[in-house]
Amino acid sequence: MKRVMFHAKIHRATVTQADLHYVGSVTVDQDLLDAAGILPFEQVDIYDITNGARLTTYALPGERGSGVIGINGAAAHLVKPGDLVILVAYGVFDEEEARNLKPTVVLVDERNRILEVRKG
């Protein structure tokens, strides 16, 4: 059996921009993507801590060291600059992979600088 499991998370990031007229996605500082192990164009869920909104989109790489978390397209109606969010990526794993999975959690400060990277 295959299982859908969370494998990476960027926790309590602050949204820095929103562009309603961009063609979808979330732009994320490449340093954060690398730390979490999230690839460009990988599907991610966004959980808005501030207002409870939840949505699915894909990650686009942003400028390294910029701290950018940019909500693009229609999602800009739901998630606003200044909101705290959690970005989560899931993968499909077989039983053994799922049981041995050690998800990556990236904790950031209010400027989206990496504070800590946790495995498992």
From Swiss-Prot:
Substrate binds at residues 57, 73-75. GO terms for cellular component: cytosol. Pathway: Cofactor biosynthesis; (R)-pantothenate biosynthesis; beta-alanine from L-aspartate: step 1/1. GO terms for biological process: alanine biosynthetic process; pantothenate biosynthetic process. It is found in: Cytoplasm. The keyword Iron does not apply. Belongs to the PanD family. This is Aspartate 1-decarboxylase. It comes from Thermus thermophilus (strain ATCC 27634 / DSM 579 / HB8). The gene is panD.
